[in-house]
């Protein structure tokens, strides 16, 4: 059984259109991430590649089943 660091609503994530990935800051300084495809497949766990923390993503599964994207601010990564 997974132990979640936190539960975060998808609206609190930043969305990168190029990679179709949602990002949320992790306490370690890296970012939790989950792809649009993972959400469409019903997966609701975002992982941080910089540490072992995972978070539960709160989102409307019906919204992603239709291939829709939740409008959130884009992140310009430079």
From Swiss-Prot:
What's a Gene Ontology MF term here? metal ion binding
Does the keyword Zinc belong to this entry? yes
What InterPro entries would the database entry show?
A: DPH3/4-like (IPR044248), DPH_MB_dom (IPR007872), DPH_MB_sf (IPR036671)
Q: In this protein, which residues make up the domain named DPH-type MB? A: 4-60
Q: Which Pfam families match?
A: Zn_ribbon_CSL (PF05207)
Keywords from UniProt, A to Z, are:
Iron, Metal-binding, Zinc
Q: Which domain of life is it from?
A: Eukaryota
Annotated Zn(2+) binding sites: 26, 28, 48, 51
Q: Which GO terms describe its biological process?
A: protein histidyl modification to diphthamide
- Domain topic, free-text comment: The DPH-type metal-binding (MB) domain can bind either zinc or iron ions.
Tell me its family: Belongs to the DPH3 family.
The protein in question is named Putative DPH3 homolog B
The organism encoding this protein is Homo sapiens
Q: What is the lineage of its organism?
A: Eukaryota, Metazoa, Chordata, Craniata, Vertebrata
The gene designation is: DPH3P1
